[in-house]
């Protein structure tokens, strides 16, 4: 299932990514969890993932945006301080070169390959987010994905997997 969904996402056009990402951001900006959040964990989109980066410029100086930095078996987060402070990390994804953020994260915007109606998530398979989320039980977790990535049937999940508080697609929000 993971490979099929990733392939379908990679086939999206630039216009489809921009349109659907804008629809998701529009919903997100109306949600109290985002409005009230001081610290927001983002991600750098790869392979046509939903692109939330326009929020960085729009809310610059109003919110602290964080991005993941991966290590061999773990993930930490660092504040975003402009594109010129981003360097490709060990997985080839741009990461901030700022000091590690140790405070509370109000809202986490989490990518995924597949989500279900019960807000379970399948990621890329490395377990980075699940291990990280377990250390932040009080943070609000929103999954973001395209409509075709949200399945009506349950996706496989285990005890160590973390359910999202909400899943947002261009068409709907569940949670």
State each model region's role.
Residues 51-54, 77, 118-121, 153-154:
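Short glycine-/acidic-enriched loop or helix-start segments at secondary-structure transitions
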Residues 1-103:
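N-terminal active-site beta-alpha-beta segment that forms phosphate/nucleotide-binding
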């Amino acid at each position: 299932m993971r490979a099929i969904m990733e392939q379908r996402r990679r086939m999206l056009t630039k216009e489809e990514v921009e349109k659907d990402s804008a629809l998701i951001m529009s919903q997100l900006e109306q949600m109290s969890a985002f409005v009230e959040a001081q610290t927001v964990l983002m991600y750098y989109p790869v392979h046509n993932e939903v692109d939330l980066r326009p929020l960085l410029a729009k809310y610059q100086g109003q919110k602290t945006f964080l991005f993941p930095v991966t290590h061999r078996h773990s993930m930490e987060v660092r504040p975003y301080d402009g594109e010129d402070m981003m360097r490709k990390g060990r997985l080839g994804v741009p990461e901030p070169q700022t000091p590690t953020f140790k405070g509370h994260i109000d809202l986490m915007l989490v990518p995924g390959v597949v989500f279900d109606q019960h807000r379970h998530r399948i990621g890329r398979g490395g377990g980075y987010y699940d291990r990280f989320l377990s250390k932040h039980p009080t943070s609000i977790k929103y999954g973001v994905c395209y409509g075709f990535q949200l399945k009506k049937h349950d996706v496989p999940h285990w005890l160590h997997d973390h359910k999202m508080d909400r899943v947002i697609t261009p068409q709907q929000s569940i949670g």
